[in-house]
């Protein structure tokens, strides 16, 4: 556990550090999420970190995909109609990595209606985009860092580990060795590992021995695995998290209420935790916020965020004067 003196020093350091800009699924505000093209654009924009949501394929290959389902961002229903489950959905875990590689990725749409979720973004069905594996993405980022002359970090999320376990697969057990093999293993490496499930975060630290930076993601009240988010947001909950993780990732709705900053970040800093809220979208501003500049002021100056997940890294970087 951290001493009171160390926690106080961490709180001061957190407030002094320049905030990091995290490309949420890449530059997903202008290109289909988690595609190679989206990550290249985000890197060129200058994002500090590029996010990877990670799920498993049938043959245990980590895939960069936001959901365990494939039917909201690909043409899986057209190419593999026989893989539809009784609930009407198509799961990455039911296709091999080679099969997933044949799918065409597109802008997110409602799997029931086929309508694009964000109609003013990249047109659904336009262009040829693919779903990458984690290994492919890490290789891409390494090459972008080499040719771009700067080292952008990675920000992988273990998606639904308890669901994967029910399906007979150990997501973290497969992903962590790949991260280590690619040079992401310690606190000094530019990598934040994130997850919404408290039990899995605890397992990552205590059972799997992960020494790198970890962010505990916080949802509304209770997670599908039983994680009590409301309790974790209390002073006692934040203090308890400080002995396990490096920071928290709350929703922007917990940071901004009717155009005003809440006290969550200040309380987290007091506990010695970094705070990287999600997700800022320039085309869907928080309630009570008139533009990107005002949002940046509230999030970084008033609330004191140490970083921000955004679909529009270029706009956030501009607001920060970078």
Predicted ranges, named:
Residues 3-13:
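Sec-dependent N-terminal signal peptides
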Residues 14-322:
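Phosphate-group recognition and catalysis centered on beta-loop-alpha active-site segments
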């Amino acid at each position: 556990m951290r001493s009171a003196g160390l926690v106080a020093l961490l709180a001061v350091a957190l407030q002094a550090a320049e905030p990091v800009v995290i490309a949420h699924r890449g530059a997903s505000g202008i290109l289909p999420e988690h595609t190679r093209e989206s990550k290249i654009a985000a890197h060129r924009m200058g994002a500090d970190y590029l996010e990877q949501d990670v799920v498993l394929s049938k043959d245990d290959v980590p895939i960069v995909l936001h959901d365990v389902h494939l039917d909201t961002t690909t043409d899986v229903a057209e190419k593999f109609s026989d893989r539809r489950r009784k609930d009407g959905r198509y799961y990455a875990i039911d296709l091999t990595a080679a099969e997933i590689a044949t799918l065409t990725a597109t802008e997110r749409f409602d799997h029931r209606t086929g309508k694009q979720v964000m109609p003013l973004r990249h047109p659904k069905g336009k262009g040829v985009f693919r779903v990458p594996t984690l290994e492919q993405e890490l290789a891409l980022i390494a090459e972008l860092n080499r040719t771009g002359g700067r080292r952008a970090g990675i920000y992988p999320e273990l998606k639904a580990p308890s669901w994967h376990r029910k399906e007979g697969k150990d997501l973290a057990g497969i992903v962590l060795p790949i991260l280590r093999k690619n040079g992401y293993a310690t606190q000094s490496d530019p990598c934040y590992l994130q997850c919404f499930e408290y039990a899995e975060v605890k397992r990552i630290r205590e059972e799997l021995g992960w020494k790198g930076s970890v962010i505990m993601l916080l949802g509304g009240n209770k997670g599908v695995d039983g994680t009590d988010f409301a309790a974790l947001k209390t002073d006692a909950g934040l203090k308890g998290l400080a002995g396990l993780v490096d920071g928290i990732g709350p929703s922007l709705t917990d940071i901004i209420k009717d155009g005003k900053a809440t006290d969550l970040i200040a309380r987290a800093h007091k506990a010695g935790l970094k705070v990287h809220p999600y997700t800022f979208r320039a085309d869907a501003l928080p309630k009570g916020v008139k533009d990107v500049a005002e949002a940046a002021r509230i999030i970084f100056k008033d609330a004191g965020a140490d970083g921000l997940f955004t679909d529009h890294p270029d706009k956030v970087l501009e607001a920060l004067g970078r």
